[in-house]
């Protein structure tokens, strides 16, 4: 198997395991506490990489505000709302909703930045949105027997929160 395919499979596996492991931690620490802990760990890992590599590539001073704004919207707000969604909907549904960040980014780029979307890109947005809707709402009428399928509160409120999380990630990536 080519390395890029292995990397894609590894990333998908990490994404799936992370959603499952994060639910209990987000419930125990709360969305803000869990995100704060996670970002602290990421900062330590980044510092270790910079120390080992011996250098840090600079960012132009005029771009720092964009980086900060992107982080606040995408990582702080988007991820915090994602953890609220994870607690309310479980890892399967929240992960599916969060996958809408790519089609949302494409649509935001088209609307705000004048980017062009090909027919294939539009079809991809429609198909991925329909797939997410089926994954999230397809079992909404059936009571889940597994704790990962249990919904806390209104499904529609949780779906709205998941859409806000995906939109925050999409907007953060465009900035």
Which residues fall in each region the model found?
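Small-residue-rich packing faces within the transmembrane alpha-helices of Major Facilitator Superfamily
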Residues: 16, 40-44, 104, 129
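Glycine-/small-residue-enriched transmembrane alpha-helix faces in small-molecule transporters
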Residues: 1-33, 44, 146-175
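Loop-to-transmembrane alpha-helix entry segments
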Residues: 4, 57-62, 98, 105, ...
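Hydrophobic core positions of alpha-helical segments in small-molecule transporters
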Residues: 10, 37-38, 70, 97-100, ...
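Structural motif at transmembrane-helix junctions in multi-pass transporters
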Residues: 27-33, 80-97
């Amino acid at each position: 198997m080519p390395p890029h395919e292995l990397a894609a499979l590894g990333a998908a596996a990490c994404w799936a395991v992370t959603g499952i492991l994060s639910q209990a931690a987000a419930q125990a620490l709360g969305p803000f506490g869990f995100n704060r802990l996670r970002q602290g760990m990421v900062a330590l890992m980044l510092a270790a990489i910079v120390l080992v590599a011996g250098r840090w590539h600079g960012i132009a001073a005029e771009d720092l505000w964009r980086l900060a704004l992107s982080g606040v919207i995408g990582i702080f707000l988007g991820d915090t709302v994602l953890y609220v969604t994870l607690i309310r909907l479980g890892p399967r549904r929240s992960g599916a909703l969060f996958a809408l960040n790519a089609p949302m980014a494409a649509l935001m780029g088209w609307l705000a930045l004048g980017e062009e979307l090909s027919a294939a890109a539009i079809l991809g947005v429609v198909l991925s949105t329909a797939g997410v809707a089926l994954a999230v709402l397809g079992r909404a009428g059936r009571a889940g027997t597994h704790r990962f399928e249990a919904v806390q509160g209104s499904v529609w409120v949780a779906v709205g929160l998941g859409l806000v999380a995906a939109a925050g990630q999409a907007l953060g990536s465009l900035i």
